[in-house]
Amino acid sequence: MKKLIAILLCLVMVVSMVACGGEKNPPPTDEKVITIGVFEPTSGQNGAGGKKEILGIQYANSLYPTVTIGGEEYKIELTYADNQSDSSKAPTAAQQLVSKGVTAVLGTYGSSCAIAGGPYFEQAKIPAIGTSCTNPQVTQGNDYYFRVCFIDPFQGEK
């Protein structure tokens, strides 16, 4: 339940961040869309955990499929990239989301993939919010990666 609440809060934070920015090139259709990238493993060692986070994100999106910004309604669409629970493959997944032009990113389950993908989001100036990446290095030196969970030192010493 706590993880679901964290994911819901994460989605609210993303929507709030999006409200602060402007879309330079709106879609050519009448429907305005905000695309949120989901940077989660659906395969590999952390695939099961990533799938649970995806379910939480999808649930939050089903509850809040639109957001009103400046009096205009925007549809929130999700697009996915499987980082395969592998820090050597996470940069490719991050680049996929950047190339899709996402407005913000949610994820990932597993700190090593967040650390590996984070520089790509930072370079593209895309805010990313991790719900379970607890390693302090995820956000250190990256002004675009945030987290809604505690960090490893808070959990206790080894």
Predicted segments with their positions:
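Short, solvent-exposed amphipathic alpha-helices that sit
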Residues: 49-65, 89, 128, 155-158
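Extracytoplasmic "Venus flytrap"
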Residues: 30, 37-58, 81-87, 109-112
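Structural motif
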Residues: 74-99, 155-158
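Sec-exported extracytoplasmic/periplasmic mature domains
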Residues: 58, 62-66, 95-103, 119-126
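Extracytoplasmic ligand/sensor domains, especially the bilobed periplasmic-binding protein
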Residues: 102-158
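Second-shell loop/turn segments in exported
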Residues: 42-48, 80-83, 103-104, 143-150
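Short, low-complexity disordered leader/linker segments with a strong preference
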Residues: 1-35, 66-70, 99
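Signal peptide-proximal N-terminal region
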Residues: 26, 54-80
